[in-house]
Amino acid sequence: ASDVYKRQLEYIPKVRRLVFEGKYLEAQTLATEKVMAKTNSGMPYQSFGDLHISFPGHTRYSDYYRELSLDSARTIVRYKVDGVTYQRETLTSFADQVVMVRLTASQPGKITCNANLTTPHQDVMVATEGEEVTLSGVSSWHEGLKGKVEFQGRMTARTQGGTRSCRDGVLSIEGADEAVIYISIATNFTNYKDITGNQVERAKNYLRRAVSKDYMTSRKAHVDFFKQYMDRVSLDLGIDKYAGVTTDMRVQNFKETKDDFLVATYFRFGRYLLICSSQPGGQPANLQGIWNDKLFPSWDSKYTCNINVEMNYWPAEVTNLSELHEPLIQLIREVSETGRESAKIMYGADGWVLHHNTDIWRVTGAIDKAPSGLWPTGGAWLCRHLWERYLYTGDMEFLRSAYPIMKEAGKFFDEIMVKEPLHNWLVVCPSNSPENTHAGSNGKATTAAGCTLDNQLIFDLWNQIITTARLLGTDAEFATRLEQRLKEMAPMQIGRWGQLQEWMMDWDNPQDVHRHVSHLYGLFPGNQISPYRTPELFDAARTSLIHRGDPSTGWSMGWKVCLWARLLDGDHAYKLITDQLTLVRNEKKKGGTYPNLFDAHPPFQIDGNFGCTAGIVEMLMQSHDGFIYLLPALPAQWKEGSVNGIIARGGFELDLSWKNGKVSRLVVKSRHGGNCRLRSLNPLAGKGLRKAKGENPNKLYAIPEILQPIINKEAKLNKVELKKTYLYDLETKAGEEYIFLGK
């Protein structure tokens, strides 16, 4: 069902007029009543159900142990009953697309259990087909819309010794030496336009292919598939001093122990989560990745586009998982198609638009209520991922395919942006600085014009279009037009208390500790704010972040790790990691980390895991400011360590070791050739290094010049003190490796 309707076009100008008249709450109220979607806010991501395995006589047990292996993507549960050790090994096979549960015991003939499938869905049927149990159904209704995803799960087993049988939806195993339970799940979903797939045949084929193989062969295929991604990167922050301590207690004790092996594990866990939740050909990681046990999860576990889904993919390129970016890129392709209807019907504009949320059906209209949903710049933020993919890979064919998407997003803003009456700046209106109320409405409304995030996003998007058009030798007239339009936009502003303004007006409250820090997009993930190029804005961003505070929702703290790293303050970034690694055992506490290392908003949101994973790399290496900065935000806690396999823009793979806080060894592997500019806090020695001069000739490191910021006369700015560094150029050849030692 569409989430746009024709009368929205009639009311958006009325909302805009109220904003320009300073009647922000009236504008927001009108938008909620007349502009926001009435019948469809997107469909939820839903759980299939549960596997239950009961073991008669296992109520009294000892030596209980469980683990998740980040080396092999398997879980192990082990315990003893009456002197017998039982083990349950579970994996969800990348290679075979089935769940496998292997049951073993230390004595023969001891595996006896009953297994069944249950689901919270209502429209379901459980059946037995020979040696298979099936659970079939259809996704649930939501907000008056009928679920249309038909699904089937199939379960069977293979045993060594003993007997097995299926009856009344229960799989029974008795007296086996070993058993493997197999579960396949399939749906009729092919893509957002096609649900004609045959879920029954798909589930049958997955299951029958899997059971035809030896378990150990299947396990090896799964582990090999996983390791091709996981083993690309390693992080060493020291020995494991607490190997015998359970994960929840390690998190609970982190503030006292400074358990940096846990930090390295948390980093690895972030990569594990992306590998498992974002495989090419599938859907992108949503608010909970793929790990949702409810029919109606918080925020429907969809794709929130005003920070969250973007944060999910911050680690993709930099931690050497570029292929796993593809599901998000495919989503961007698809919302650029569905977003045409929203642009035309809601705004009367060409191009495409995405507001703050989408789902598997790629809705793009303004959903929920105006305080969050009236934000039309989601497409601009997503387009940054197309650009970043190009910067990391240098893939011109990819850029050529992405350019029409970027161009049409840019065309939409070219048509809908208007001149505001106070400064005559070109702005987006109506919009909001995501989910944050402002003083112009006495804290009662978010709706505004010319918000800093919008300006930064469109500045980036239009510059990316201009650069790409010239690289491809196309659309010269449109590129020239956008260059002129950029000059008419609102610049960044530094407000009365030295802060980077979040809004066009100086409304920022120094006591505001809102979870979103949207106006700092230009610092991270953007690159408009730099200690070298824009020191005043750099200081203002720091002032804003100090006043925003540290403790917050889990995902907000993950973002702040990245921001403090960009502010070159490793100790403060480490403090945010410490805050994020605060144990949360229930839904009532503030943000932190659950006992299994899932990020706590609360509830669980996966973006915090991914944000912190990216932030740890930002502490060790940055490549956004025209050069590769080695150890830019190394905390005092990490005196010695190494990271291998991380990726800098331009396609440079780095192995980096340090001792006493200084680079000791660096290996640069050049994938595409070109100039590699390095900045280091200590001198480097090695063949090919020369002192850097002028602009970096590598086009993947070019940075557009921003508009001159406006600084309030009352603002008291601090001088940005930069550490002495050494800047080198290295001309590289594709496929070559270069080794340097620190002095």
Describe the function of each predicted region.
Residues 2-371, 388-390, 407-410, 421, ...:
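Aromatic-residue-lined binding/catalytic grooves and analogous aromatic/hydrophobic interfacial grooves
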Residues 114-116, 327-330, 345-346, 398-408, ...:
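Beta-strand segments within the central parallel beta-sheet cores of soluble alpha/beta enzyme folds
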Residues 289, 293, 426-428, 435-436, ...:
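C-terminal catalytic domain of Rieske-type non-heme iron oxygenases
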Residues 307-317, 376-387, 453-463, 518-527, ...:
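Well-ordered alpha-helical segments within folded domains of soluble proteins
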Residues 308, 375-389, 398-415, 556, ...:
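Extended, hydrophobic alpha-helical segments in both membrane/secreted and soluble proteins
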Residues 393, 469-472, 571, 623, ...:
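Long alpha-helical scaffolds in large eukaryotic adaptor/regulatory proteins
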Residues 408-468:
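Acidic/histidine-rich catalytic neighborhood
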Residues 599, 606, 620, 625-648:
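Acidic, turn-prone loop/beta-hairpin segments
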